[in-house]
Amino acid sequence: YGSSAASDVYKRQALETVLGYIIALILGLGFGIAISFSSILRRTLYPFFVSIEMTPKIAFAPLFISWFGFGLMPKVIIVVLVCFFPIVLNAILAFNSLSNELTLFYQSTGASRLKTFFTIRLPAALPQCFVGFKYAAINATVGATIAEFIGSDKGLGFYISIVTGNMRPDLAFAGIFFLTVLGLTIFGFVTMMEKILIPWHISMKRINK
């Protein structure tokens, strides 16, 4: 591996991780909101999501690799899987924990359901949602790297295996350091968005003291 090839490996790892996390964030929050508003979806999808969350997602990696090859897609799918469930389960908990009396009172003033959602329900649910966002951020780099260790011919996990076998621990530690920085960057960005969106929450006030 030359410097150019190593740079491509790092870029690929970042792309897999960030893309998978963003997709999981959109899907997880979307399903969480939908399930919280629908009793039918709550009875059908929630138990399914809980059962899948208890299944080691990495066990699916060989299947995805056999279906989609060694390209980008199976790695992104693994990242989506390991990030999706913390997000969706915390979103369901967040939106189902809100007081119905408060939302009904606000609607009684003439507010529409859409306005009630953005004014009352979403702000109140965001603190718990961010718990899922941050937990998923921790999982993202782990999921992408393990998927590459299991089956890949290009990614950073594969690169670390190769340079370790070639007795280059310096390059292996450089890869591990990059993974740490990547994970901290994603986590830090989520934390920054948390401070911007919910500065009023007690957890933010304690952090900022």
Where are these regions (language model features)?
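Short helix-capping/hinge motifs at transmembrane helix termini and TM-loop junctions
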Residues: I35-I40, F68-F70, V82, I150-S152
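Hydrophobic alpha-helical transmembrane segments of polytopic membrane proteins
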Residues: G157-E194
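Generic hydrophobic transmembrane alpha-helix motif, especially the helices
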Residues: V50-P86, L93-A94
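Transmembrane alpha-helices
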Residues: I77, L81, L114-I146, L179, ...
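Transmembrane-helix boundary motif in ABC transporter permease subunits
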Residues: L19-F49
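Short helix-to-coil transition segments within interhelical loops
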Residues: F95-E101, F105-A125, G165
